[in-house]
Amino acid sequence: MAKIIDGKKISQEIKDELKERVAALKEKGVEVTLAVIQVGNNPASTVYVGNKKKACAYVGIRSLAYELPEETTEAELLELVEKLNKDDSVNGILVQLPLPNHIDEDKVIKTIAPEKDVDGFNPESVGRLSIGQKGFVSCTPAGIIQLLKRSDIEIDGKECVIIGRSNIVGKPMSMLLLRENGTVTICHSHTKDLKEVTKRADILIVAIGKTKFVTADYIKEGAVVIDVGMDRDENGKLCGDVDCADVEPKAGAITPVPGGVGPMTIAMLMHNCVSSVEE
């Protein structure tokens, strides 16, 4: 039976460590400030933004909320980002995605100053990661590395397979695993004989947005399975890209949905905010 990797518990440990670091900064008269921008009122985005504000309050980070109407123009949004770039009291800027269709997401992400890009999405941040330089790392992949390390799961020399090649998870994940000396394969919708590839994995990371796609026949005995998916099953119940009930008896360790990768993403966002000030 698989060991359950408890993302809630590990993310709480990280937030508690950050709380101490923020308190130490405050003693020196330094305040950590995160600006969060939401355009429109996408219900999922509102929940995510609320969770981020809650985490900020817990850790001791000051959060500035900019809730803009759906009809905000691209120019108005870019102007706000530029203003926050120039504001020395703001350490991190986060624009909640997705943005309304009339706004070019790439343009907005590129406008965020790399030294305030706590989401790690700016092309400069991505470039730094790919050549092994210091910079902000996308929060979900960074959180997965922490889940593995804090669960004493060895990455060095291990066969690591990622299903999904998104810019937010798959690609940065591959870079971080390489940094830890994992042997990395990325699979996607054009991969031939997917099961043959995934069965080689000591560590399998699944991020494709397909409900319960990975079943026991995709993994080898004792594999570590990290489920990044956030889907709903036919009964409307929250689940992931992995059929947990089917995979769990065969896996060595597995992340649940909810309570696995999700909480880590926000913990690492807080980590990026605090690091931006300390450095």
Predicted regions and their residues:
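Anion-binding alpha/beta catalytic cores of soluble intermediary-metabolism enzymes, centered on
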Residues: 94-155
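Glycine-rich phosphate/diphosphate-binding loop of Rossmann-like nucleotide-binding domains
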Residues: 41-53, 135-224, 228, 233, ...
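Short beta-strand segments
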Residues: 38, 94-98, 163, 207, ...
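Short beta-strand elements in bilobed, periplasmic/extracellular small-molecule ligand-binding domains
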Residues: 56-70, 184-186
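Short, well-structured alpha-helical segments in soluble
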Residues: 76-88
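Positively charged, low-complexity intrinsically disordered leader regions
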Residues: 1-30
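Short beta-strand segments enriched in small/hydrophobic residues
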Residues: 32-40
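Rossmann-fold NAD(P)-binding glycine/threonine-rich loop
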Residues: 106-122, 126, 229-279
